[in-house]
Design a protein with these regions (language model features):
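Class I S-adenosyl-L-methionine
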Residues: 161, 165-182
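Generic recognition of short, well-ordered alpha-helical segments
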Residues: 128, 160-161
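Conserved beta-strand signature within the Rossmann-like core of class I S-adenosyl-L-methionine
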Residues: 137, 144-151, 174-178
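A short glycine-rich, Lys/Arg-flanked "PGG" loop and its adjoining helix->strand segment in the class I
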Residues: 128-146, 167-168
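The AdoMet/dcAdoMet-binding core of the Class I SAM-like
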Residues: 1-115, 119-136
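Short strand-turn motif at the edge of the Rossmann-like AdoMet-binding core
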Residues: 112, 150-154
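Short "lid" loop at the C-terminus of a central beta-strand within the Rossmann-like core
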Residues: 53-54, 153-156
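Short, surface-exposed connector motifs at secondary-structure boundaries
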Residues: 11-15, 142-148
Length: 182
């Protein structure tokens, strides 16, 4: 939906670099890959993700994710300390060094937490991760590239400040609530 509504993928580019932040990989990467396949593109695309290292094999569909990662040659990065924690600057630098500074046409910040027990603090509890995703995207995106960032609410001043910061680095900023989102 976001890909089509905002025309964020230029199919004249034969080799795309896509980076998913706090994504293991998730639905947005799957949509990106399927979109590129529909145009018989994507064979040369480079796909990277950084995600928290998860050793719990009880997570539903984790084996399905592993099959997806192998099939589409997704490079999972766990950072310099092998945790995948974006709160650590060394891990952001490690990812930028692996992918290439300002080399990506598309970056997504798709991190989130389980807020089912504390929904009222969702925005506040997400601010640190959102800031880290912004820092990483600014180091990864090409000039003219696209950054899709998932945020939950826009009530706090700091969230508005983040949007203002993004407006200084990106030509356009859009807000949307996709139909399938929570």
């Amino acid at each position: 939906e976001i890909i089509n509504d905002f025309d964020i993928i230029d199919n004249s580019i034969s080799e795309y670099i896509y980076v998913g932040l706090a994504e293991a990989p998730g639905g947005f990467m799957e949509a990106f890959i399927n979109y590129r396949k529909n145009f018989f593109l994507g064979k040369k695309d480079k796909k990277y993700c950084i995600t928290l290292r998860q050793n719990n094999s009880d997570i539903p569909n984790w084996s399905k994710a592993n099959n997806f990662i192998r099939k589409y040659n997704v490079n999972i990065n766990y950072g310099a300390d092998n945790t995948g924690n974006l709160y650590k600057v060394e891990n952001i630098k490690h990812l930028i060094n692996q992918v290439g500074k300002n080399s990506s046409q598309l970056v997504t910040g798709d991190g989130g937490f389980d807020f089912s027990y504390n929904f009222d603090n969702q925005e506040n509890d997400s601010l640190r991760l959102i800031f880290c995703e912004i820092v990483a995207a600014l180091g990864l995106n090409k000039i003219g590239g696209h950054f899709v960032l998932k945020i939950y609410d826009i009530f706090l001043n700091l969230t508005v400040d983040f949007i203002y910061l993004l407006s200084k680095f990106y030509d356009k900023i859009y807000f949307t609530k996709p139909h399938p989102s929570r």
